From Swiss-Prot:
One of the primary rRNA binding proteins, it binds directly near the 3'-end of the 23S rRNA, where it nucleates assembly of the 50S subunit. It comes from Methanosphaera stadtmanae (strain ATCC 43021 / DSM 3091 / JCM 11832 / MCB-3). Signal peptide: none annotated. Coiled coil: none annotated. GO terms for molecular function: rRNA binding; structural constituent of ribosome. The gene is rpl3. One of its GO terms (biological process) is translation. This is Large ribosomal subunit protein uL3. InterPro entries: L3_arc_euk, Ribosomal_L3_dom_3_arc_sf, Ribosomal_uL3, Ribosomal_uL3_arc, Ribosomal_uL3_CS, Transl_B-barrel_sf. GO terms for cellular component: cytosolic large ribosomal subunit. Belongs to the universal ribosomal protein uL3 family.
Length: 337
């Protein structure tokens, strides 16, 4: 039998492991869909609970049986489309061509985040945008959140850029014009049973040693008797006489942007159904859900109160959308769990 060799568990694909510069996640990849519409939505992480749902997976040993499924709850108040952004392709990538910012129906707290123009002729700017359609290669929308409607103790909204679906640039532009200055709910973007990608900033854990950070083995034998166990036994060879950047060492752990693929949406509820999920005393370190909410199967990155972006899946072409049958949602108190 061969000797098991496992010098490390941490992947160098995530280097450098440093704190993210911006807690609000930035989406760099968008799926290409023919149907006009938003490709993402954002919500605040509330906490976790469990539901009892029917297993609809064909060929599963538990097919058509009820299972206890862990779920994460996101509070998803309406998002406001504050602007349209047009891009043109250059040799250096996409470059912003022009922006059109709405001047009505925007949150009063938006001025805490950006400088909002007050007297813009929107119709003239939209017509100018239509005249530049030959120079436009990509259309996206700017949206802002409404955290003051939730139990998150903040008023300043986040501003994000979301991609659009559509067969052509003209279709994307007309759809963006139709929703400019309007509120968007999660029901307008997703449907129950759909697979999405969750993008968020993970929990920060500060500076940690190589054992916790990379999963290296704790020293044993003579090395352990020296009194120092939680360190790397060798950080490199005699030649080349330098330390490689791939060597597991202590450093920042957590507070990184991460993407988790194919997270299934089990339920999308509105504000009239919050009693179905709110436990006695509210959720730990969050409070009560007051708005639209989304139940996502499994766990999501980040602590409670952190913004999570749900993007339409980029790897789920073969997955069918079937609304799950939920018979029970646990509302037992989460205090002390």
């Amino acid at each position: 039998m061969t000797r098991h060799h496992q010098p490390r568990k941490g992947s160098v694909a995530f280097s450098p492991r440093k704190r993210v510069a911006r807690e609000t996640p930035r989406v760099s990849t968008w799926p290409e869909l023919d149907e006009a519409g938003l490709l993402a939505f954002a919500g605040y992480k509330v906490g976790m609970t469990h539901v009892t749902a029917l297993d609809s997976r064909k060929g599963s040993p538990t097919e058509n049986m009820e299972l206890s499924v862990p779920v994460t709850i996101l509070e998803a108040p309406p998002l406001v489309v504050l602007g349209i952004r047009a891009y043109t392709k250059t040799t250096y990538g996409l470059k912003t061509l022009t922006d059109v910012i709405a001047n009505d129906n925007l949150d009063d707290e938006l001025s805490r985040k950006i400088s909002v123009p007050k007297f813009d002729d929107i119709e003239a700017k939209i017509e100018e945008l239509r005249n530049k359609i030959d120079d436009i290669d990509e259309i996206r929308v700017l949206i802002h959140t409404k955290p003051k409607l939730t139990s998150v103790p903040k008023k300043k909204p986040e501003v994000l850029e979301f991609g659009l679906g559509g067969k052509s640039v003209e279709d994307k532009l007309e759809y963006a014009i139709s929703i400019l200055g309007k509120e968007i709910t999660p029901q307008d973007v997703f449907q129950e049973g759909e697979y999405t990608d969750a993008i968020a900033t993970t929990k920060g854990k500060g500076v940690q040693g190589p054992v916790k950070r990379f999963g290296v083995r704790i020293q044993y034998g003579k090395a352990a008797r020296s009194g120092i166990e939680r360190h790397v036994g060798s950080i490199g060879p005699w030649t080349p006489n330098r330390t490689m950047w791939t060597v597991a060492m202590q450093g920042q752990m957590g507070y990184h942007k991460r993407t988790e693929y194919n997270k299934k949406l089990l339920k999308i509820g509105d504000e009239s159904e919050v009693d179905l999920i709110n436990p006695d005393g509210g959720f730990v370190k969050y409070g009560f859900v007051k708005n639209n909410y989304i139940l996502v199967k499994g766990s999501l990155p980040g602590p409670s109160k952190r913004l999570v972006v749900l993007r339409k899946g980029v790897r789920n072409a073969s997955k069918q959308v079937t609304a799950p049958e939920i018979s029970y949602i646990s509302t037992t108190s989460k205090q002390g769990v």
